[in-house]
Regions:
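Glycine-rich phosphate/diphosphate-binding loop of Rossmann-like nucleotide-binding domains
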Residues: 7, 11-42, 148-231
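Glycine/serine-rich phosphate-binding loop and adjoining beta1-alpha1 elements at the start
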Residues: 2, 8-10, 79-163
């Protein structure tokens, strides 16, 4: 099989879906690896490292699409790539089909075989862990008074209480956010619909966090005392309900922060 690694062209995307380590494995398994020049540069992997791993460097994405049986990159396809798709060719990339119906149609029209990278991680994508931790830090930055927040210190100070944080969703994203906020001294409540997850987290943190079943009623009861909410729920596609609706936002105090890490279309 000919494996093709594309350089991501979406504005602001610096990741690569395959490092030289993965290329070494692919080549050692007897496959041919084509890598577009600069595919890993912004992620810290030089073209020379891919060559040393056994890859052949090519200049354009057109060459990758024309020669490769398996084509991969991080982010969804751009319109300029639609005409390059071939019947029977395997595409592995983020697609986010609910948000990009025109891209789904282009894939169907081409006859290629496409896998949604965002849904392929059995134990949760490393990106989920990174998003949870980074989301927690961005929330704390937004809490600064210079950014319009309450100006609270996350762990509190002598005579001043710690920040109260509500995490919606106890999966990979929520657990990553929890690890950061708990370590910094926030008073955290985690909500989920899975009682098993809540029990596990309660034991993991030696009963030093609060857990509740995730319902609109429970959320509404906590919002008036909550300084920051992190949405880590993967919302069902096509769902027309919300965990937090517009009237519920009025329950939160001025300067409170919401970090929508999941950021699904018509999300929670």
């Amino acid at each position: 099989m000919v494996f093709g690694l594309l350089k991501d062209i979406k504005n602001g995307e610096y990741r690569t879906i395959a490092t030289p380590v993965e290329i070494t494995t692919i080549v050692n398994d007897g496959h041919t690896a084509l890598v577009q020049r600069g595919a890993g540069e912004k992620a810290g992997f030089a073209d020379s490292a891919y060559e040393a791993a056994g890859a052949k460097l090519v200049d354009t994405m057109e060459e990758i699409y024309a020669q490769a049986d398996f084509v991969t990159k991080v982010k969804e396809l751009e319109p300029c790539e639609f005409p390059l798709l071939r019947k029977g060719q395997i595409i592995f990339t983020c697609i986010h089909p609910a948000a990009h119906p025109q891209k789904v149609q282009a894939i169907l029209d081409s006859g290629c075989i496409a896998f949604t990278a965002e849904d392929s991680h059995r134990y949760g994508s490393p990106n989920c862990e990174a998003a949870g931790k980074q989301g927690a830090l961005m929330g704390l930055e937004s809490m600064l008074s210079i950014n319009g927040g309450k100006g609270m210190f996350v762990s509190g100070l002598g005579g001043s209480p710690a920040m109260k944080v509500l995490i919606l969703g106890g999966g990979t994203v929520g657990q990553a956010a929890l690890s950061v906020l708990y370590a910094l001294g926030a008073r955290v409540t985690v909500m989920d619909i899975n009682i098993g997850i809540l029990r596990t987290l309660k034991r993991q943190y030696n009963e030093h966090i609060d857990t509740m079943m995730c319902t609109k009623e429970n959320i509404a009861a906590l919002l008036p005392q909550t300084d920051m909410v992190l949405n880590c729920v993967k919302w069902p596609k096509g769902c027309n309900d919300w965990l937090i609706d517009r009237p519920m936002l009025k329950l939160m105090g001025k300067g409170s922060v919401i970090v929508d890490i999941s950021n699904d279309d018509n999300g929670a």
